[in-house]
Amino acid sequence: VSYTHKIGENVLKDCKDVRYIGMCCSLYSEASSNVDLAYARARGIKVTGIRDYGDAGVAEYVTANLIRRLGGDDGFPPLFGEISEITGVRVGILGMGASAKAVAAGLAAFHADIRYYSRTRKPELEEEKGYRYQELPDLLRECDVICSCLSKNVVLLGEEEFQIMGPGKVLFNTALSPCFEEEAIKKWLDQENTWYFCDTLMGLGDESLLKNNHAVCLKRSSGMTRQAVERLNQKVLDNLGNYCMEQKAL
């Protein structure tokens, strides 16, 4: 089952013989899952997901587009008015899961100043990598670039948050849903020198955003590279094999 297909109670109740669902995508929580996990659990259906297969492509997508924006290589004036390196650019990352860690590592390799906001602090990353935790308002106010790597259906940015961000900023969203309220981002994009990049249409939000030439959507998952598909396939098969072995042992 891919993340593009919703498998709810209305589907599962007509599939009397289903005992196992192997998700070909990440499985973080009931709220973000496209499979009705509560109903599956009540029916005794085992559901497995996979992780850590497409993070490298996401990091490359963010890094490549930021380099173009800082250098003005996309046909618009550079973000800071003159050509800039990533060195010293203040990057605020929302969330600190696997893809966020990959983005942070990629940008840190170019000497970006990495800050992050997460529901739980990551002291080991702060000590080992030198990343800095900030509360959301401070991060939005101080950072030049905001990267949302949040779980699906998590919304953190409303009108107040975009007012704090102000102009002269870049927002990346690589989540599978918008991380913002749609009217709020439209108002923000009406300001001078504001930029929004996302990879999937699921993460874009209202497609009318693309009427603004400062909103750019790749229209495909940046993480689904050739190598990522190979990793995904192997992990799905491993999960299925483990399930079959468990059933054989019963």
Feature-to-residue mapping (PLM):
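Glycine-rich NAD(P)-binding loop of Rossmann-like domains
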Residues: 72-103
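Rossmann-like adenosine-cofactor binding region
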Residues: 5-11, 121-208
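Active-site regions of enzymes building and remodeling cell-envelope glycoconjugates
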Residues: 15-20, 45, 127-135, 209-219
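Aromatic pocket-lining residues of Rossmann-like dinucleotide-binding sites
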Residues: 106-107, 165
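A short helix->loop->beta-strand "cap" motif at the edges of active sites that frequently abuts
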Residues: 15-20, 42-45, 111-112, 167-169, ...
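C-terminal helix-to-coil terminal segments
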Residues: 41, 46-60, 75-76, 80, ...
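Phosphate/diphosphate ligand-binding glycine-rich loop within oxidoreductases
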Residues: 1-74
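NAD(P)-binding Rossmann-fold cofactor-contacting core
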Residues: 109-127
